Amino acid sequence: MAERLTIIDFVEKYVAKYSQNPFLWEKNLDTNQWEPTTYEETLAKAKRIAAGLMALGVQKGEKISYLSEGRDMWVIGELGVLYAGAVNVPLSIKLGETNDLVFRVKHSDSKYIITSKFQLAKIRAILPECPLVEKVIIFD
């Protein structure tokens, strides 16, 4: 039977193989140029985020809801959640109805929410209805 790789195994396998190759590309809005983040840089940033999450008290198996637009930090942050041993609960920015966000956060038993400054208003609006949420983390 073939070995089953976890996402972490997959990332580490390809970081070892392609460490200096671009993994992510993001447009710098100041220069209007696309800038790469290598596999190695992505892994290092993800591990720093994982360390930060663990320092905040995130425990293995805890749920973290994640609301952000598509960008490098979304990928890196999700990897950080996995490296911390937590479970990522992705939330779509297309969820315009407060009830949809509340439902997903409450029913996932998320104790933390990671968001961008652009989505923060949505999160602030639902916090009173999500008593299990202990912390909101803003990536910006």
Role assignments for model-derived ranges:
Residues 2-25, 44:
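A short N-terminal helical cap/helix-turn-helix that marks the beginning
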Residues 24-71, 75-79, 96-102:
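Conserved AMP-binding/adenylate-forming core of the ANL superfamily
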Residues 28-31, 118-140:
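ANL superfamily adenylate-forming
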Residues 65, 112-114, 137:
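Structural motif
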Residues 85:
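Structured binding elements
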Residues 91-93:
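Short beta->alpha connector loops at strand-helix junctions that form conserved
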Residues 95-126:
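Conserved ATP-dependent adenylate/AMP-binding module captured primarily in the ANL superfamily
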